[in-house]
Swiss-Prot record:
This is Aquaporin Z. It comes from Flavobacterium johnsoniae. The record marks 42 as: Selectivity filter. It comes from the Bacteria. The record marks 19 as: Involved in tetramerization or stability of the tetramer.
C-alpha cells in the first residue's frame, strides 16, 4: 500500500506541476514562460518526486511504464 500511495502521489505531482505549468504558460503567453519553462517545470517535478518517494516505489510516476514492465514480465502485479 505504501508503494501504491507513493506512485499515486508522484503521478499527481507530475500532472499538477508539469501539466499545470503548460496550462499556465498557454493561458498567460505574455509572461514568457515558453517551452523551456514548461520543460523545466516537468523536470523539476520528476526530480522532486524521485528524491521524495523514488526509494519507496522505484519512481515510475507513469502508469503506462508500470503496465509495460508488468506486460514484459519485469514487474510483478503485487508490487
Amino acid at each position: 500500500m505504501k508503494k501504491l500511495f507513493a506512485e499515486f502521489f508522484g503521478t499527481y505531482w507530475l500532472v499538477f506541476g508539469g501539466c499545470g505549468s503548460a496550462v499556465f504558460a498557454a493561458g498567460y503567453p505574455t509572461l514568457g514562460i515558453g517551452f523551456a519553462g514548461v520543460a523545466l517545470a516537468f523536470g523539476l517535478t520528476v526530480l522532486t518526486m524521485a528524491y521524495a518517494v523514488g526509494h519507496i516505489s522505484g519512481g515510475h510516476f507513469n502508469p503506462a511504464v508500470s503496465f509495460g514492465l508488468w506486460a514484459g514480465g519485469r514487474f510483478s502485479a503485487k508490487d
